[in-house]
Regions:
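Enriched but not universal
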Residues: 176-188
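Extracellular, repeat-based ectodomains that mediate carbohydrate processing or recognition
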Residues: 1-179
Length: 188
């Protein structure tokens, strides 16, 4: 219990921890109420909840991106105030490991993640009509361990490890496409 944990603070500064319960194969969420921990099962549809990333919206409600190993999908869960709303973001193969979640200025989710089979790096974002998905870096063994941040203009910056070359890379998602300006080689 407690693998792949991700911590955020709600609007009152209380901790909320999303984690993968390996014994049950479930995604769980623990929220401090001020006097006790409230633990909920977010998703229990098979082996779900590993490689997760959590963010809190402006009201402090949890949003979680995670891998569904049973189906091989990237999923997204949002606390609605009364329950968890779950969506499948990407179901195009064994996809969704190393998820990194950020929320834009309007609270819309953005997720960087990789394909478990090929280490292809992808970026997904929510629009008014659904999820949009962009391939950031393709090819066998090209990306792992992604981390996403949004700049002051809401543009995505994704750091990731390039296992083929043993390099740390930085991708910038620009209006014209993907820009890969930074490369730091392994000194060993």
């Amino acid at each position: 219990m407690g693998r792949h944990a991700s911590l955020v603070l709600n609007a009152q500064g209380d901790p909320q921890i999303a984690y993968y319960d390996a014994g049950q194969g479930d995604l769980k969420h623990a929220a401090w109420t001020g006097s006790a921990w409230l633990v909920q099962t977010v998703d229990s549809a098979g082996n779900v909840g590993s490689y997760l990333s959590q963010a809190a919206d402006a009201q402090g409600a949890s949003r979680i991106a995670y891998y569904d190993a049973g189906q091989g999908d990237l999923k997204y869960a949002a606390w609605t105030g009364s329950g968890w709303h779950i969506q499948t973001v990407d179901a195009t193969g064994n996809i969704g490991v190393h998820a990194s979640l950020a929320l834009d200025e309007l609270g819309r989710p953005r997720i960087a993640y990789t394909n478990a089979g090929s280490d292809e790096l992808r970026y997904a974002w929510w629009t008014a009509v659904g999820w949009e998905i962009q391939v950031v870096r393709s090819g066998k063994n090209t990306a792992a361990s992604s981390s996403l941040a949004l700049d002051e203009n809401g543009r995505a910056r994704i750091s990731f490890y390039d296992p083929a070359w043993r390099h740390l890379r930085l991708a910038s998602i620009e209006p014209f496409g993907v820009y890969l300006p930074f490369l730091m080689g392994d000194p060993n």
